[in-house]
Amino acid sequence: MRRPFSLLAGALLAGALTVSAVPAASAADGDDGFTIKDPRIKESSGLAASRQHPGVYWTHNDSGYGPQIYAVDGRTGETVATVTLSGIGTPRDVEAISIGPDDQIYVGDIGDNRGGTWPYVWIYRLPEPKELKDQTIRATQYVVKYENGARDAESMVVHPKTGRVYIIDKNEDGGHLYEGPAELSASGTNIFRPIAPVDLWATDAALSPDGEHLAVRGYFGGIHYDWNGGRIKRAGRLQVPLQAQGESLTYSADGSKLLYGSEGADSPVVAYDAPGAGKKGTAPSSRDGSGAAGSGAGGSGGLGAGTLAAAVVAVVAVLGLGRLLRRRR
């Protein structure tokens, strides 16, 4: 995945504010945040809550790694199963994971490090194992193309009721929600067509367990939508934690939480109440116009005014240095 210089500023900011920005985990159900402890998981780029195994979350590495997904215990942060996918080619740039009907896991090999020039990408589907142990499971591979040409993407969701797959492309100026065919075909090419704009540089997305709400995150903000049969309607902004490389998002299995993950070793997964959860003492979202995403107002991950001001100065300084270096080239 490409990492623009401006993201470096965000990484420095997130690193400086990790203690302030990450709310403490307290519950024992694994849905209140954790730290991924497995040293093999250095670029967690997708997250999905297990439906068969309460408190367990599936994740995977980004590009340059093998065909493995990992089951992580949300109570301890420890890996409890490593699943190797067989029956597929060499993964290229895996960016997303989602669970559909009948406990089917979908893995999105949909990233494009060449900036949207690969003529096709892939989706892999496999059954979620009933037993959590290291094992190899045969997966089905689907070829995906976009109706309006190749593009980079990091967000894929599967509707929990219909099983239809959707992708959001990654564009700094905003992307689109792409709808796949009613059923994916393993024997032909699956064409995804744009059906709605998404006003965000999207790095991941998640559908609520009831299929009624779509949450989309970027590096520094997020939006939640009413699903509306895929003709999404913007409902408000999401509070997104400041993270070094925030590229994963999932609802908890009961839909009460949104969990935000990041790339990096020992990366934290931060939990906020999902829109409408109504938990006291948090501010997971705001209606449009009522506040900025990530403001932290009223939440355990909130930032003090002095800390935020210092952080802004640091970001401006880093961006200024970047411009100076570019002029000297």
Regions found by a protein language model. Name each.
Residues 2-10, 14-18, 23-329:
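Sequence/structural signature of beta-propeller domains
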